[in-house]
From Swiss-Prot:
Protein name: DNA mismatch repair protein MutH
Gene3D superfamilies reported for this sequence: DNA mismatch repair MutH/Restriction endonuclease, type II
Main location as per UniProt: cytoplasm
Compartmental location: Cytoplasm
The species this protein was found in: Salmonella typhimurium (strain LT2 / SGSC1412 / ATCC 700720)
One Pfam family cited in the UniProt record for this chain: MutH
InterPro entries: DNA_mismatch_repair_MutH, DNA_rep_MutH/RE_typeII_Sau3AI, DNA_rep_MutH/T2_RE_sf, Restrct_endonuc-II-like
Length: 231
């Protein structure tokens, strides 16, 4: 049996990607970091994206911070998702930055959100803060595409939120808007402002916004998958 090691090049097929992801299941983050020659931070306060970066290394992801999917040749996006002991998501899932200007003619079919969610490799990771970061285990992966109903739910929320952005109501949007998709500020500090449209159509400066999947949406898709896998 060959020793487990990170993929040095992007996987050539979904089957190879999923096979590698399945091999990581059951390992701790500390074990995977040590095998990849990476130091595990004490916590994620200063390294919020560390788990994602670690798994990108193991799975041969190519995109880095570019707007395309993590596995561009396969059209697959990687999403790590922290879960509790019952496999329920502990936080919302970032999808992409929301465009606050230049949105004339944009449709759900051509949107960045839909592009990012077209095909996703979900990798659950233990997220209970009582477990030291190095001891948190990686779970069983799921390769997912939205069903017709999921696509409909996402589209309705996206259209409502984009209508508000275009009509100059971005600052009235709260995390409560949307059934499965929400829009909320995404900035490392409150001084990082970006241009948007105000209530009277004038240019304004506001915090950058990001689209996030709500926990009810990711919980339902994970529950369906793992119930199917473990009847």
């Amino acid at each position: 049996m060959s020793a487990l090691c990170p993929l040095l090049t992007p996987p050539a097929s979904e089957a190879l990607l999923l096979a590698q992801a399945r091999q990581l299941s059951g390992y701790t983050l500390g074990e995977l970091a040590a095998m990849a020659g990476i130091t595990t931070p004490k916590d994620l306060k200063r390294d919020k994206g560390w788990i994602g970066v670690l798994l990108e290394i193991w799975l041969g992801a190519s995109a880095g911070s570019k707007p395309e999917q993590d596995f561009a040749a396969l059209g697959v996006e990687l999403k790590t998702i922290p879960v509790d002991s019952l496999g329920r998501p502990l936080e919302t899932t970032f999808v992409c930055v929301a465009p606050l200007t230049g949105n004339s003619g944009v449709t759900w079919e051509t949107s960045h959100v839909r592009h990012k969610l077209k095909r996703v490799l979900w990798v659950p990771v233990e997220g209970d803060r009582s477990i030291p970061l190095a001891e948190r285990r990686v779970g069983s992966p799921l390769l997912w595409s939205p069903s017709e109903e999921e696509d409909r739910q996402l589209r309705l929320d996206w259209e409502e939120l984009m209508d508000m952005i275009v009509l100059g109501q971005v600052e009235r949007i709260t995390a409560r808007h949307g059934e499965v998709l929400q829009l909320r500020p995404k900035a490392a500090n409150a001084r990082a402002l970006t241009e948007a449209i105000g209530a009277r159509g004038e240019p304004i400066l506001t915090l950058p916004r990001g689209f996030y999947l709500k926990k009810n949406f990711t919980q339902a898709l994970l529950a369906r998958h793992f119930l199917l896998q473990n009847p």
